[in-house]
Amino acid sequence: MDKRVKAIVLNDPGIVRPEDSEAIPVLILKSPHKDSEFTRDRVKWETEFARRAKPGIQMTLVGGNHVNFGDLPLIMDFANVSGDSKALNDTVRTVLREFFGEYLLGKHSELIEKGAANYPLLKIETQP
């Protein structure tokens, strides 16, 4: 990995390879997984990837799906978008701002460490 990279976010990644992880701050922000053999493997890969990071944080966007990680649900009418698009988008944007604020700018973030009542769509799986 390029040494200029100081922190990364994987927004609802497809497949991650644990051996590609680095000892830098990593946030894996994901939609809920359906239970299947593939997703059980995917959870193992994501967990190992996060374990190798320093720190490795995993969060789930409750009620969302892959489309909710961008702004398309806000500007286009998608039939397959679940949940409150604005609330989900606000949660994603805030988490990204807080994560990079903490790990690139040194601004402490309670949201990243503990979550927040005003962001009920965010579930912290592993903490820093």
What kind of feature is each model-predicted range?
Residues 3, 63-128:
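Alpha/beta-hydrolase-fold serine-hydrolase catalytic core, especially in secreted/extracellular enzymes
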Residues 17, 47-50, 101, 111-113:
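Generic structural signal for short, flexible, solvent-exposed coil/loop and linker residues
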Residues 7, 39, 43-49, 118-128:
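Short flexible/disordered coil segments
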Residues 1-22:
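Primarily recognizes the serine-hydrolase "nucleophile elbow" in alpha/beta-hydrolase
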